[in-house]
Amino acid sequence: MTKQEEIIKEIILAARKIQDFLWGEPNKNWGLEEWKRMFRKRIVKIDDIDPANPHAVIELKKRLLQNAALSVALLIRLDNGLPGKENVDVVPSNLPEYAD
């Protein structure tokens, strides 16, 4: 593993710890639709990055790391089974604008 890959790995692991600290309990209660909304929101934010912005690459890396942290959180959640509809109303969505 290159030094850069090692750093990226450490960042993703740290992001996962932060994600779990902030959202550990709600993660257990969100249904699959809420997870989809979270990913849609990140994709919209990636689409909104202006390539002319001198900080576009940094912004893209930040958004990709957020997606990586979400992916890891969902992978861990999947160890307990697929989040189902039974969880949909437990925690109200804070991302209703990203619903299907």
Located regions from the model:
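Flexible "arm" and connector segments at domain edges
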Residues: 1-100
